[in-house]
Amino acid sequence: MLVPLVKTMAANRKSWDTFEAMRAAAQEGDAQAQCYLGVCYQNGQGAEQNHHEAVKWFRRAAEQNDSVAQCYLGVCYWTGQGVPQEFGEAAKWLREAAEQGDPAAQFNLGMLYETGQGVPQNYAEAVKWYRESAQRGYPAAQFNLAVFYETGQVVPQDFTEAVKWYLAAAEQELADAQCNLGLCYQTGRGVEKNPAAAVKWFIKAARQGNKTAQHNLGLHYASTEAAELAVLEEAKDAPQPP
C-alpha cells in the first residue's frame, strides 16, 4: 500500500452538539476541537471544503501535542494537500504522533521508511513501526507486516506468522489481506491446505472488488468440489436463527 492513511477519531475523544460550538471551542484553544475543525474543513462537513483552513487548524492542535492532528498534518505534508508537499515535514509530524502511540501515524511512518521519503530508506525501521501499529490493531500495518514475513525481507521468513497477521487484517475486512490469506490456504503456506477456506476468503475479497481474488475465485469454481465446500463454509459464517 502506498497511500498514507489516517484513522477516524477515537471513541474517547470529545464531541460537540453543533459546528458552531466546536468552532468556538477551537478558537478558545481546545486542541481536540481544533483537530475536529480541521477534519470538517478537509472533508467539507459543516463548512465549505478548504484544505488550507484544515491545515491551519491541524497545525494549531498539533502544536499542542494532539497526536491525531499531528498525524493529519503529517499526511497533508506527505500528499501536498493544503501545503506544499514536503516529505521531511511529513516525517517530523508523523514521528511526533507515532511516538505517542498513534497507530495510523506509526503505519504511515513505516511507509516513509519503506519508501525512503523524508527519511533514509530503512526496511528494519519500517518493520518496527508496522509492528507497533499492527499490535494496536491497525489493519493496513498488519497486512504490510504479514508481507514482510511472507517474503522474508528484513525478518526471517515465517509463513505461520504471515498467516497470523493476514488473518488479523482480513477479519477487519481488508480485501488485500483476505486475498492473500486465501492464497495461503490455497498453497498450504503457513496453514494446512484448505480449498474451501481459500474460496471463502477469495469470496470476501472479491466482493470488495479485489481483482486477484476474483481471478482466483474463477479458477476455484472450475472445481465443483471446491465450490461445494465453499458453499458450506459460507453457510457456517451466516447468522443463525434464534
Predicted regions and their residues:
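Terminal, low-structured helical/coil segments at or just beyond the last alpha-helical repeat
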Residues: A10-D17, Q214-P242
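Hydrophobic face of amphipathic alpha-helices that form TPR/SEL1-like repeat modules
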Residues: Y36-N43, Y72-T79, N108-T115, N144-T151, ...
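Short helix-capping/linker turns of helical repeat alpha-solenoids
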Residues: Q27-D30, N43-Q45, N50, Q64-D66, ...
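Cationic, low-complexity basic patches in intrinsically disordered or flexible, solvent-exposed regions
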Residues: C35, Q64, C71, Q100, ...
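N-terminal segments that cap or nucleate solenoid repeat domains
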Residues: L2-N43
